[in-house]
Amino acid sequence: MHLLIAAAGSGRRMGADRNKLLLPLLGRPLIAWTVDAALTATEISWIGIVGQDIDRAEILDALGSVKKPLVWIQGGATRQESVLRGLAGLPEGARHVLIHDGARCLVQPDLFDRCAVAVEAGAALIAATPVTDTIKRVDEHGMIRDTPDRAELWAAQTPQGFEVEQLRQGHVRAQAEGWSVTDDASLFERLGWSVQVLDAGPSNIKVTTPFDLTVAEAVLSSRTTP
């Protein structure tokens, strides 16, 4: 399975002036933990890091020598453009792809493997977790409009997996139509294509704020403590 890791993370909400994926996490850059999980996953055979040129040297230096094919792909101005460039950078003949946020550094190798197996069996899917809070839909004034049924709500995460050519066609269509979506599954929804969820468990968080970084440190410490 081919894996694209989105690595153009901003440090703005972390209060940092650099890519948050380069922030230290238990003595290593955050992205190193993400890549470690991909390297350990038995179903992942190729890794593409999609990022900005300003971060290239530092990210690749942080990863060091790895035992799987790993390439750098220059990202675009938006996530959508970066994914399209990532697809263009896949090896010739690649049929399926997983796309993962570099900031989800708590991902477990098993999650990559489960997603890969399901995608290769024909599914378009996203890792997700059932929503446990009661969700309120509000209007522009902050007044509650209604309460969606929590049993139907899942929080979308990554990896997200698709057939390469179908995903490429979707992004080309989005580019032509001027659509803006927050993830690849939203693009499939807009085109009427089916996507299923795969339960990622509770710990597959995206590190976005300083609090998230504290949580990630605690989780990783618990995993590495004998």
Curated annotation (Swiss-Prot):
Pfam family membership, one: IspD
Keywords: Isoprene biosynthesis, Nucleotidyltransferase, Transferase
SUPFAM superfamilies membership: Nucleotide-diphospho-sugar transferases
Function: Catalyzes the formation of 4-diphosphocytidyl-2-C-methyl-D-erythritol from CTP and 2-C-methyl-D-erythritol 4-phosphate (MEP).
Residues the record marks as site: Positions MEP for the nucleophilic attack: R150, K206
UniProt site (Transition state stabilizer): R13, K20
Protein's UniProt keywords contain Transcription: no
Cross-referenced NCBIfam families: ispD
Family, as annotated: Belongs to the IspD/TarI cytidylyltransferase family. IspD subfamily.
Gene name, Swiss-Prot/TrEMBL: ispD
Protein name as it appears in the record: 2-C-methyl-D-erythritol 4-phosphate cytidylyltransferase
Catalytic function, reaction form: 2-C-methyl-D-erythritol 4-phosphate + CTP + H(+) = 4-CDP-2-C-methyl-D-erythritol + diphosphate
Pathway recorded for this protein: Isoprenoid biosynthesis; isopentenyl diphosphate biosynthesis via DXP pathway; isopentenyl diphosphate from 1-deoxy-D-xylulose 5-phosphate: step 2/6
Top EC class, one word: transferase
InterPro entries xref list: IspD (IPR001228), IspD/TarI (IPR034683), IspD/TarI_cytidylyltransf_bact (IPR050088), ISPD_synthase_CS (IPR018294), Nucleotide-diphossugar_trans (IPR029044)
Organism: Synechococcus sp. (strain CC9902)
Gene Ontology MF terms in the entry: 2-C-methyl-D-erythritol 4-phosphate cytidylyltransferase activity
Gene3D superfamilies: Spore Coat Polysaccharide Biosynthesis Protein SpsA, Chain A
Record GO biological process: isopentenyl diphosphate biosynthetic process, methylerythritol 4-phosphate pathway
E.C. no: 2.7.7.60
HAMAP family for this protein: IspD (MF_00108)
